[in-house]
Each structure stands twice: as structure tokens, then as C-alpha cells.
Amino acid sequence: MPVPKKKTSKARSRRRYAVWLGKAKLQAQRAMTIGRAILSGRNTGFYYPKAKSEEEEGEE
């Protein structure tokens, strides 16, 4: 089984971790932006199923 020849340096592992955290932060920011757009009614660029109103439920 292959194994690494040398130990990964602290600087390299911290840099990788920082990149990973940055990507996670960006995804969280995008999710919050989309959520705000949906709640404020400014959403035009994507589709999501709307909840049925009480009037529509009575018809079925």
C-alpha cells in the first residue's frame, strides 16, 4: 500500500484548511442570499415549488 514519503508541513495543511473554510463560507453566503431573495420576493432566476394556499387545498 502506498504511503506518503514525508510528513505534510503545518503551513501546507493550514493553507489547505483555509481554502476549505473559504469555500464553505462562500457556499453559506450564497445560501443566505438565495434565502433572503425568496423571503423578500426578489427571486427571478430560479424555480422552487410554492406552498399551496388554503383555497387551492379546498378544491382538491
Curated annotation (Swiss-Prot):
GO molecular function: structural constituent of ribosome
UniProt keyword Protein biosynthesis present: no
A Pfam entry, by short name: Ribosomal_L32p
GO BP term (any one): translation
GO cellular component: large ribosomal subunit
Keywords attached to this entry: Ribonucleoprotein, Ribosomal protein
Keyword Transcription: no
Family under the similarity heading: Belongs to the bacterial ribosomal protein bL32 family.
Protein name, as recorded: Large ribosomal subunit protein bL32
Lineage per the UniProt record: Bacteria, Bacillati, Cyanobacteriota, Cyanophyceae, Synechococcales
Gene assigned in the entry: rpmF
